[in-house]
């Protein structure tokens, strides 16, 4: 059991295709912990409401894990958003603020019978302030992103000022693997999982898929586990023509032209 802890939150950063999101979700699932997840396209209002509800349900001593996947969009898309999470990850009196009038939304939720959301808004409405302010001292953030948060060239100067503060408040892990290691990680995930449980790939199919990725790696548009899942989809749905679909879908246009 951990005796002391200087930082509660974690950033896992690295290029696409090395299993960051998959492995993080796998650990969360194995731990059977209370969590919520946000990905690319999550609006500030959606994050605030779900976070408010999750925190409002916590008892003393309980913890809520919040996975911020695709954080290049969810956390680091602009200065205002990054600044919100900077305060949410502060050591002393941390909070997540949604400084938008939610009274109209509250009335709509009440009319629709969504008392869970009404109660979440009421729980964190602060007299004299607009919107809701959610204490995050019982929240543990896991941030998964592609950009190197220690490299100022990855951000505008203004955004980086907030990013620096976030990194200072987290355990930061940058994963930079050469392609052989990245491929090995993908192959390991594929070997131990089924992209589609109801239509399992055989061991031979898995080897063929992983071998194709190994051979084509430098010319592939993307090498993430999502690509592996899509390749498995073609293999299952089109057993006689999946290789042509792989080539058409996953090989860079420039590589195709060079091979002509």
Which sequence ranges carry the predicted segments?
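Walker A/P-loop nucleotide-binding motif
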Residues: 4-24
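Conserved AAA+ ATPase small/helical "lid" subdomain
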Residues: 182-255
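Loop/turn-to-beta-strand initiation segments
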Residues: 61-66, 135-142
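AAA+/P-loop NTPase substrate/partner-engagement loops
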Residues: 18, 30-64, 73-77
